[in-house]
UniProtKB/Swiss-Prot annotation:
Pfam families named in the record: Hormone_5
Source superkingdom: Eukaryota
One GO CC term on file: extracellular space
Name of the molecule in the record: Neurophysin 1
Source organism (scientific name): Struthio camelus (Common ostrich)
Length: 93
């Protein structure tokens, strides 16, 4: 196991590199939303060849198995799901 290593940010991806890779076929960004298996995600496959782990997103979600990728979306390297804890603003009536 690799412990005490600096976890680096995953590669940037998407239009104008405004997103980050969340898995080999997932690219998400606050302003972009998420791309799945598109040309925007091709660069994310390069992560598979890098020796160090990476992390995207800031806030953990999905039972701490993923992190917030875009407004209302939680992603892990397996996929993404809707998660209200990732909403940009939680409105109170």
């Amino acid at each position: 196991a690799v412990l005490d290593m600096d976890i680096r940010k995953c590669m940037p991806c998407g239009p104008r590199n405004k997103g980050h890779c969340f898995g080999p076929n997932i690219c998400c960004g606050e302003e972009l939303g998420c791309y799945f298996g598109t040309s925007e995600t091709l660069r994310c496959q390069e992560e598979n060849f890098l020796p160090t782990p990476c992390e995207s997103g800031r806030k953990p979600c999905g039972n701490n198995e993923g992190s917030c990728a875009a407004s209302g979306i939680c992603c892990s390297n397996e996929g993404c799901m809707v998660d209200s804890s990732c909403d940009q603003e939680v409105m109170f009536p």
